[in-house]
A protein has these predicted regions:
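C-terminal regions of mature proteins
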Residues: 2-11, 203-205, 331, 352, ...
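Active/ligand-binding-proximal structured segments within catalytic/core domains
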Residues: 26, 34-84, 272-285, 294-297
C-alpha cells in the first residue's frame, strides 16, 4: 500500500489575544483578556521541577510545593485557602519534571487579590521547622496512598526512569524517598526558595475578564518590589541515547494482572518540527478504537485489556523538555505472555514504518488532536496554564494560537519516519508482574 498523501485538515486555529511585559526584577507576565465570562485564572510557573533536585534530596521540589501553601509574609498558614475559597475560587499547585506551578481561578472582581496572594509568597514563604515536619508527613502519606498502597502505583512514571536514563537528574524518584524527605532541613528549604523562586525564574500568566493594562499595573504594584535575585543557569540534562535494549521486571503485590511499559527516547521537544511527528504517532497508535494498537490488541487479538501511548513521563507532551520518552503502556491478562505483547508492538511499528499511513488516517488523527486541544484552551485556566508553559519553555506564549497550525504541518512521511526509529533494539522495557518477588 503506498504512503498516504498529505491532505489539508479542515480545522481552525484560535486567535486569542496575548499581551506581555517584564518587570525590572525579571518576572515575565503574559495576559489573555477575554470578557466572555466574569472569571479569571492566575497562574505562576517556576522554572524548577523534579529534575533540579540535588542528590540526597529526592522529592524536594514536591515537598517545597507543599510549603508554598503554609503561609507567607502577610498571610497565616491557611489564609491563602481562606481568601481564595471565600471569594468563590479554587486553587492548586503541582510539581512536574521541569517546573512547579500554582494557580487560582476566581471571579474576575478578585483578580487583584489573586495577584497579591501569589506575590506575597513569591516575596517570602513561611519556612519553619513545624511547617517542614508537617508537610514531610503529608508528602509521605501521599506516597503511601498513591504509590505504595495502590495497584500499579507509580507505574510506569516512577519505575521506568532508572532503566531509561543513567544520570541522577533524569533517573531518580521525583515523588521522594522517605529517608531523603526526613533528612530535609529548614536551611535546605530556604536555600531552595532563594535559588529557584526568584522573580526572574518565574512566569505570571493571567487569562479572563481583565484589562491587560490594569493587570500590568497591579503586577508592578504587588510583584515589582520583590528584589531581583540571580537566576540559576539551567544545566543541560541530556545524556547519550541507549544503543541496546534495556529490560527489567518490577513486582507489584497489589496488581491484579500484568502490565508492560515500553519507552524510547525522542528528539528534543524544543524543536517542534522534529518532535511533533512523535506526538502524532502516539495518537495514531493508541487514541481510540480505530488506532493501530487498540484495534489490533483490544479488538482483533484480544491480547490486552488497555493500551495507552504518550510522550513525557506525566503524559503531557507539550510541557516536556529534553530528554523525554515516548511511552507505550499495555495492561494484559496472565494468559497473554509479555513477549506476545512486545511482538505485536514491534509488528505494528514496523508495518507503519514500511507501509505508512492509510488514506485519511493523518487527517482524522490531527482533527481529533486539534479538537481536544481547543477544548482544553477554551477555559481560562487551560489558556493561562498553556501560555505559561509555552512562555517558560519556549519564550513564546503565542504558541497558544499557533499549535493547531503546527500540527497541520506534520506530514504522513514524518510520522512514518518517526515510527521507523522506534525499534526493539533501542527500546527500554519494564515488565510488571503481579505478586511479590520470589
Amino acid at each position: 500500500m503506498p504512503p498516504a498523501a498529505k491532505t489539508q485538515v479542515r480545522t481552525t486555529s484560535p486567535s486569542y489575544e496575548v499581551q506581555r511585559m517584564a518587570l525590572a526584577n525579571g518576572l515575565r507576565i503574559v495576559v489573555n483578556p477575554d470578557a466572555s465570562s466574569p472569571v479569571v485564572a492566575v497562574a505562576v510557573y517556576y522554572d524548577v521541577g523534579m529534575r533540579s533536585e540535588p542528590q540526597g534530596r529526592t522529592g524536594f521540589a514536591h515537598l517545597f510545593e507543599h510549603l508554598m501553601f503554609q503561609g507567607s509574609e502577610n498571610l497565616g498558614k491557611t489564609e491563602h485557602f481562606t481568601y481564595v475559597q471565600g471569594n468563590g475560587g479554587t486553587l492548586n499547585g503541582s510539581t512536574h519534571v521541569d517546573y512547579t506551578n500554582y494557580y487560582e481561578v476566581m471571579p474576575s472582581a478578585a483578580t487583584e487579590l489573586a495577584l497579591f496572594l501569589e506575590a506575597d509568597r513569591m516575596r517570602s514563604v513561611a519556612v519553619t521547622q513545624d511547617n517542614l515536619d508537617n508537610q514531610i508527613a503529608v508528602v509521605q502519606n501521599e506516597i503511601r496512598v498513591n504509590v505504595l498502597n495502590r495497584p500499579y502505583g507509580g507505574f510506569p512514571w516512577l519505575k521506568i526512569p532508572p532503566l531509561l536514563f543513567t544520570d541522577f537528574a533524569n533517573s531518580h524518584n521525583g515523588y521522594g524517598d522517605f529517608v531523603d524527605l526526613e533528612s530535609s532541613t529548614v536551611q535546605d528549604a530556604r536555600g531552595f526558595f532563594d535559588r529557584y523562586y526568584a522573580p526572574g525564574n518565574a512566569v505570571l500568566s493571567v487569562s479572563g475578564d481583565v484589562d491587560a493594562a490594569q493587570v500590568f499595573a497591579w503586577a508592578e504594584q504587588h510583584f515589582g518590589d520583590i528584589p531581583a535575585r540571580e537566576v540559576p543557569t539551567r544545566p543541560s540534562f541530556s545524556e547519550p541515547l541507549p544503543t541496546e535494549q534495556r529490560r527489567d521486571v518490577e513486582h507489584d503485590a497489589l496488581a491484579p494482572a500484568p502490565a508492560v511499559a515500553v519507552a524510547w527516547r525522542v528528539p528534543d521537544p524544543a524543536d517542534l518540527t522534529t518532535y511533533l511527528p512523535y506526538v502524532v504517532l502516539a495518537e495514531v497508535l493508541t487514541d481510540g478504537d480505530a488506532s493501530r494498537l487498540q484495534e489490533r490488541m483490544l479488538l482483533q487479538d484480544r491480547s490486552a485489556t488497555s493500551v495507552g501511548g504518550y510522550l513525557g513521563l506525566l503524559g503531557d507532551p507539550l510541557d516536556a523538555r529534553d530528554p523525554t520518552p515516548f511511552l507505550l503502556e499495555v495492561h494484559h491478562s496472565e494468559q497473554t505472555p509479555v513477549d506476545t505483547v512486545l511482538t505485536t508492538i514491534d509488528e505494528e511499528l514496523a508495518r507503519l514504518a514500511s507501509d505508512g499511513l492509510t488514506p485519511g488516517e493523518l487527517d482524522r488523527t490531527i482533527a481529533r488532536m486539534t479538537a481536544r486541544y481547543l477544548r482544553e484552551v477554551d477555559s481560562v485556566l487551560g489558556r493561562a496554564t498553556t501560555m505559561a508553559v509555552f512562555e517558560q519553555q519556549r519564550d513564546r506564549a503565542e504558541l497558544l494560537n499557533e499549535l493547531p497550525g503546527l500540527l497541520r504541518a506534520v506530514t504522513a512521511q514524518q510520522v512514518q519516519a518517526a515510527a521507523a526509529t522506534l525499534t526493539p533494539q533501542t527500546a527500554t522495557v519494564l515488565e510488571l508482574r503481579p505478586g511479590k518477588a520470589s
